[in-house]
From Swiss-Prot:
This is Alpha-glucosides permease MPH3. The chain crosses the membrane at residues 107-127, 143-163, 179-199, 201-221, 235-255, 271-291, 364-384, 398-418, 427-447, 460-480, 493-513, 526-546. One of its GO terms (cellular component) is plasma membrane. It is found in: Cell membrane. It is a multi-pass membrane protein. The keyword Thylakoid does not apply. Induction: By maltose and maltotriose. Repressed by glucose. One of its GO terms (biological process) is maltose metabolic process. Keywords: Cell membrane, Maltose metabolism, Membrane, Sugar transport, Transmembrane, Transmembrane helix, Transport. It comes from Saccharomyces cerevisiae (strain AWRI1631). Residues 582-595 have a biased composition (Basic and acidic residues).
Length: 602
């Protein structure tokens, strides 16, 4: 916090000086300034400045130049302070920001819950008999593979639509109101699921509920990354993964209860659907009182509201707090202005592919999130069904699922500790490497039909869940918030999540064919397939995924602009606020009567 203390003191001195000499000019300052382009003046893009020595009163333009350099210097100091801020200091300074971020991310509990109960329903006896068909060979009731695929496609298609609607909605009304609208529709669409009497009604309900889920997927990550400092970014973005796991654990517990008490009652599947009404109302009320993202407000030119929003995320009071707010707004403005100079247009989906820099950032973000599906994690979502098809009893299958989600929660907490010693890329790559090994072992056990091998394959799937939630699962939520530029963050995250959804659809279809007894009936041998796909994902990460740990958004922007290779991101040092030949005090006997000054665009 040394930089921050120095900056606060400097700001106080500057304020004091302005009070001592109100309306007066220093004798060495030039009389007036003529600029080439008035629009560039506001964007820190000063390419030519001329000083005339014939008078001594400073003009308004001269004040603008001073303000520009002060703002750039303040932004640099604020950026350095954020990068060097310890975790304890960040929590003490931004406790409200952390609390608001946790509240918004809690919306993901509902998506994790519902997607988990859908997979568990396929192993629930009452659900199988009411909506399934009987296998002529075994006499067992089962939901057909085509319907399992159809239901999965429905909610994922709904998420894709919801994600695409999220972009224009955020542009229009902001993050908070978009989330509140999504929560309202989720509560309304749940009625369709509760009163379902056919798989067709469930399909419609899943598709409609998928739209607000898509909104939650995008905004929880972007909101957490924009409202919190660098020291808290990893913890609060990866909390999204914890919310998924809490939802899945909640679902596993409810489904185990349904399997025990309501195995032959419609409450076995109606009660899990009804419990989705618990969270929308309290979450909507909490989000209504939450501050809007200051980055969104600055992009809209609403600077006073951005300052009010930042005040609500900071602790303390007095002039120090106001200085921190001003510094943060300056940093956000400088960052956004630098990005805007790359294009004069408002950020759109086409801008994500407009030039080489943005194409690279979009590609990495999309493939990074798609890696959550290609690493075999979709199999974890069908764990209860997998255990049953691997030969484990129905009751033990539900017990295994609960243990699996508990291990996932522990692994995510462990990743918070590991993030102090390992980077984002390290956790992503190590997790993939361990999963690859375990999947091949599961496939090998699937070649045996003994009771021990069946229990072993089920136990190892829990190991996959542990390594997944230690590495790739939590770190992806942080990476996808850091890779895009601030101007295109929401839209890039939407594209990335939709890429994940499309890949997940393909992976889900493959898994259902692999596990269904009427189709390929691979059982645990499917581990071979996912081991190969997981290894391919690891190769991509080694080649293309940069290390962003310890880098602020402005530094990441500069590294991408310079075209630094993925494996050199960590070691490359940049100064995003470099100023070339800044204007100095001008003597009145300047022989030419003019001085040129240049400021680096980026």
């Amino acid at each position: 916090m040394k930089n921050l203390s120095f900056l606060i003191n400097r700001r106080k001195e500057n304020t004091s000086d302005s009070n001592v000499y109100p309306g007066k000019a220093k004798s060495h300052e030039p009389s007036w300034i003529e600029m080439d382009d008035q629009t560039k003046k506001d964007g820190l893009d000063i390419v030519h400045v001329e000083f005339s020595p014939d008078t001594r009163a400073p003009s308004d333009s001269n004040k603008v130049i001073t303000e520009i350099f002060d703002a750039t210097e303040d932004a640099k100091e604020a950026d350095e302070s954020e990068r060097g801020m310890p975790l304890a200091t960040a929590l003490n300074t931004y406790p409200k920001a952390a609390a608001w971020s946790l509240l918004v991310s809690t919306t993901l509990i509902m998506e994790g819950y519902d997607t988990a109960i859908l997979g568990a329903f396929y192993a629930l006896p009452i659900f199988q008999r009411k909506f399934g068909s009987q296998n002529d060979k075994t006499g067992e009731w089962e939901i057909s593979a085509s319907w399992q695929i159809g239901l999965t496609l429905c909610y994922m298609a709904g998420e894709i639509v919801g994600l695409q609607l999220t972009g224009p909605s955020v542009d229009l009304v902001g993050n908070r109101y978009t989330l509140i609208i999504a929560l309202f529709f989720l509560a309304a669409f749940t009625f369709i699921l509760y009163f379902c009497n056919s798989l067709g009604m469930i399909a419609v309900g899943q598709a409609l509920c998928g739209m607000p889920w898509g909104c939650f997927q995008c905004l929880t990550v972007s909101y957490a990354s924009e409202i919190c400092p660098l020291a808290l970014r990893y913890y609060l973005t990866t909390y999204s993964n914890l919310c998924w796991l809490f939802g899945q654990l909640f679902a596993a517990g409810i489904m185990k209860n349904s399997q025990k008490k309501y195995a032959d009652s419609e409450l076995g599947y109606k009660l899990p659907f009804a419990l989705q009404w618990i969270l929308p109302v309290p979450l909507a009320l909490g989000i209504f009182f939450a501050p809007e993202s200051p980055w969104w407000l600055v992009k809209k030119g609403r600077f006073d509201e951005a300052r009010r929003s930042l005040r609500r995320t900071l602790s303390g009071k007095g002039p120090e707090k106001e200085i921190l707010v001003t510094l943060e707004v300056d940093k956000i403005k400088v960052t956004i202005d630098k990005e805007k100079r790359l294009t004069s247009k408002e950020g759109s989906y086409s801008d994500c592919f407009e030039d080489k820099i943005n194409r690279r950032r979009t590609r990495i973000t999309c493939l990074c999130w798609a890696g959550q599906a290609t690493c075999g994690s979709i199999l974890i979502g069908y764990s209860t069904y997998f255990y049953e098809k691997a030969g484990v009893s129905t009751e033990m299958s539900f017990t295994f699922s609960i243990i699996q989600y508990c291990l996932g929660i522990c692994a995510t907490f462990l990743s918070w500790w590991a993030s102090k010693y390992f980077g984002r890329y390290d956790l992503y790559a190590f997790g993939l490497a361990f999963q690859t090994i375990v999947f091949f072992i599961i496939g090998g056990l699937g070649c045996s039909s003994t009771h021990g091998s069946k229990m072993g394959s089920g136990s190892l799937l829990m190991a996959v869940a542990f390594f997944y939630n230690l590495g790739i699962a939590p770190v992806v939520f942080c990476l996808v918030s850091e890779m895009p530029s601030s101007r295109l963050r929401t839209k890039t995250i939407i594209l990335a999540r939709n890429t994940y959804n499309v890949v997940s659809i393909i992976c889900s279809v493959l898994i259902l064919y692999q596990l269904n007894s009427k189709k390929w009936n691979w059982g645990a041998k499917s581990g071979f397939f996912w081991g190969v796909l997981c290894f391919c994902t690891l190769i991509w990460a080694v080649v293309d995924l940069p290390e962003t740990a310890g880098k602020t958004f402005v530094e990441i922007n500069e590294l991408f602009k310079l075209g630094v290779s993925a494996r050199k991101f960590k070691s490359t040092k940049v100064d995003p606020f470099v100023v070339k030949n800044p204007p100095k005090d001008v003597s009145h006997n300047d022989p030419k009567g003019d001085i040129e000054a240049s400021i680096a665009e980026e």
